[in-house]
């Protein structure tokens, strides 16, 4: 049984390091996909799904920071943890400023890395959920968005109708459309799905 909440990837140009890191993480119960360069990773992985990548900083052709930038430009929810054999404090600070969740110097302590991976996977799943909610909200009309905001604030239908200068029936139709488009059946499910992005 894998302990992965979402896919775990390692990108490192040093094959012995790649293999030993994968072996160590598999011994902790993870299922791991490995790549020896950034291009192979980009061609193989769906950047719009949750995941965690352990990324070497210094690789030929495409450095880890370049790969991370490409992922950020794609709005990827995949969490990044840097691993390097040649790190320093300024490099770590820059990586964290760029959105990496953690930075480890090789050789790395397995327990510390596992804790960071578990945290990164949870963060990635939350990021994917937020992105999914934002995309779903884009399908709403302007008026449906207005009604949604008022619903999330806890306003009653008649009060919404008065505030938006429309009939009660119009509010009920918009509210029903919002529920259908967001694929929820209750107010609690609606708030859970989009309350954090409004």
Task: Label every model-predicted segment.
Residues 2-17, 21-25, 38, 53-56, ...:
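Conserved acidic segment of CheY-like receiver
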Residues 36-37, 63-67:
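Acidic catalytic/metal-coordinating carboxylates
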Residues 43, 65-77, 94:
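Short amphipathic alpha-helix used as the core "switch/output" element in two-component signaling
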Residues 59:
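Receiver (REC) domain active-site loop signature in two-component systems and cognate sites
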Residues 88-90, 107-117, 163:
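C-terminal output helix
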Residues 176-198:
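Basic, Lys/Arg-enriched C-terminal extension of HTH/homeodomain DNA-binding domains
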């Amino acid at each position: 049984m894998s302990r992965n909440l979402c896919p775990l990837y390692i990108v490192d140009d040093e094959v012995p390091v790649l293999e030993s890191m994968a072996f160590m993480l598999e011994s902790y119960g993870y299922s791991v996909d490995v790549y020896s360069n950034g291009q192979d990773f980009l061609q193989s992985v769906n950047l719009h799904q949750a995941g965690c990548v352990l990324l070497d900083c210094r690789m030929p052709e495409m450095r880890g920071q370049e790969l991370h930038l490409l992922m950020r430009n794609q709005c990827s929810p995949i969490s990044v943890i840097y691993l390097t054999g040649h790190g320093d404090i300024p490099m770590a600070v820059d990586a964290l400023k760029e959105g990496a969740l953690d930075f480890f110097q090789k050789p790395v302590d397995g327990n510390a890395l596992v804790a960071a991976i578990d945290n990164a996977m949870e963060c990635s799943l939350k990021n994917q959920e937020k992105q999914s909610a934002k995309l779903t909200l884009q399908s709403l009309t302007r008026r449906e968005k207005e009604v949604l905001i008022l619903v999330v604030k806890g306003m009653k239908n008649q009060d919404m109708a008065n505030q938006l200068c429309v009939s009660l029936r119009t509010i009920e139709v918009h509210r029903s459309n919002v529920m259908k488009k967001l694929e929820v059946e209750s107010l609690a499910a609606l708030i859970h799905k989009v309350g954090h992005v409004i």
